[in-house]
Amino acid sequence: MRAIWTGSIAFGLVNVPVKVYSATADHDIRFHQVHAKDNGRIRYKRVCEACGEVVDYRDLARAYESGDGQMVAITDDDIASLPEERSREIEVLEFVPAADVDPMMFDRSYFLEPDSKSSKSYVLLAKTLAETDRMAIVHFTLRNKTRLAALRVKDFGKREVMMVHTLLWPDEIRDPDFPVLDQKVEIKPAELKMAGQVVDSMADDFNPDRYHDTYQEQLQELIDTKLEGGQAFTAEDQPRLLDEPEDVSDLLAKLEASVKARSKANSNVPTPP
């Protein structure tokens, strides 16, 4: 893994130097877009609306458009000048019971690795969080965005690792405006009892290893079948028509034009004496 951020956790008067790593990776199969007619790869170009030129990535800039249509350019230097952007500190704001953080607020997860010769301060904070069953609510800047996050320790069996889970801001969570749930619904005791029995019959401890992404597995089987069945092609292959009937009328028109052009050329050749 490659660290995406380095800094330190500000824990009272103690600083805990850490490296930050992405804790998750998407396992979905990725597709390329191709032209259905001949399997040619689709390429997108960045075109300037003002001059019509194709713009290279290195020539791109950012701008913000206000509600009344005015725009201001925001440069990399502008971003770098912000105090929060320059900070390399994960500031602990408070320690809260782990149960207080609603899972709906979780966004992304990151591993924290000690970034010093001694891991004592790291282990001290990790053990404190574990024994108090609390999370630290922290504040830091990552990838040009101010983050509110929950810092906790997770036991991976052979080691305890501190993790940061970035949280959504309150205004990023939508209000579930479902008036139908405001209606009074009568649930009979027998119905509630029966539903409870169903839950009891399916009750178990959560073990994520017993579940698999069956869609991705089936999709991979489909791809493997096509690869092994001679349906594969490479990007260097000459694009080919795929089961599309030839436009005979267009071909005939081209042949007729060729004959006429050849006849005209022959008629202009002087007859030898």
From Swiss-Prot:
GO CC, alphabetical: DNA helicase complex
Domain Ku span(s) in chain numbering: 10-193
Domain of life: Bacteria
Chain residue ranges for the region called Sufficient for interaction with LigD: 111-273
Family: Belongs to the prokaryotic Ku family.
Lineage start: Bacteria, Bacillati, Actinomycetota, Actinomycetes, Mycobacteriales
Disulfide bonding pattern of the chain: none
HAMAP family cross-referenced by the UniProt entry: Prokaryotic_Ku
Subunit and interaction comment: Homodimer. Interacts with LigD in the absence of DSBs, and with the isolated Pol domain of LigD in the presence of DNA. Interacts with Sir2, possibly in a trimeric complex with LigD.
UniProt gene name: mku
Function: With LigD forms a non-homologous end joining (NHEJ) repair enzyme. Binds linear dsDNA with 5'- and 3'-overhangs but not closed circular dsDNA nor ssDNA. One dimer binds for every 30 bp. Recruits and stimulates the ligase activity of LigD but not of T4 ligase or a human ligase complex (LIG4/XRCC4). Attenuates the 3'- to 5'-exonuclease activity of LigD. Stimulates the template-directed addition of dNTPs by LigD on 5'-overhangs and nuclease activity on 3'-overhangs.
CDD domains, per database record: KU_like
Protein name (record): Non-homologous end joining protein Ku
GO molecular function: double-stranded DNA binding; protein homodimerization activity
One BP term from GO: double-strand break repair via nonhomologous end joining
Keywords: DNA damage, DNA recombination, DNA repair, DNA-binding
A matching Pfam family: Ku
